[in-house]
């Protein structure tokens, strides 16, 4: 069996908040498998829901841009946060994000595009930038949303300059309604997404393997109560509904008012904008996704900004 190092125990503690000895026992019982150890702790009631954290230690910038019926979001990483304040780096991220309006989520295709005004490709310009600034940099990911009729709204939380910052969000709303009112709705939903961190648009979009894993953990937790199996299954279904409310955007409670589900917010908006509204997609890129950042109350902060 692999030796359980202090670093592994520390990582598990940071992910779960469980005690040091419990973390060591969990890792011992699971032969050092981090994911299995998280589940072991949860089944024993010693940890909160698993958090994907700590594995990516990236700085840099996230960029967003919107066209009339499309939007793009890109994350470009560097080694230190100092680079994010470099005007040349900011200009690079902004231009690359605009190019992603055409290339979408294909980073390889994005890197092969001509970089405006240089005679170089994006990849070549990035190499040039690395040599100039002296830090390693990578285009980590890109995404694009579009609508046939309606708008794609953007939101940037913790922006250093317009459309560049630490958390970028896109929201696609299909509707023939009033564009200005749609933009207002889109902005508020985008701010909600920044705070609430949904993982899927609708229940049907939830990763089946992740859902099955969650069910297994919830079932073991419920059985620990000693109740009959049919009661256990009802408890599990209730907890699965709660899980959906945590990770599915349309099932989440709107952080702006604290009571209405996003599904209902979108449905009600049809009356305001003058035509039915459908939320067809979203993107949320957080810089160095998974790193736990100290913040007083992010959801409350976004809600106050939106209100």
From Swiss-Prot:
Localization per Swiss-Prot or TrEMBL: Cytoplasm
InterPro entries reported for this sequence: EF-Ts_dimer_sf, Transl_elong_EFTs/EF1B, Transl_elong_EFTs/EF1B_dimer, Transl_elong_Ts_CS, UBA-like_sf
Gene Ontology terms for molecular function: translation elongation factor activity
UniProt cross-references to CDD domains, sorted A to Z: UBA_EF-Ts
Keywords: Cytoplasm, Elongation factor, Protein biosynthesis
PROSITE patterns associated with the record: EF_TS_1, EF_TS_2
Pfam family, one: EF_TS
Any one annotated GO CC term: cytoplasm
Keyword Protein biosynthesis found: yes
Region (Involved in Mg(2+) ion dislocation from EF-Tu): 80-83
HAMAP family: EF_Ts
Role description: Associates with the EF-Tu.GDP complex and induces the exchange of GDP to GTP. It remains bound to the aminoacyl-tRNA.EF-Tu.GTP complex up to the GTP hydrolysis stage on the ribosome.
Family recorded in the similarity comment: Belongs to the EF-Ts family.
Protein name: Elongation factor Ts
Source species: Rhodospirillum centenum (strain ATCC 51521 / SW)
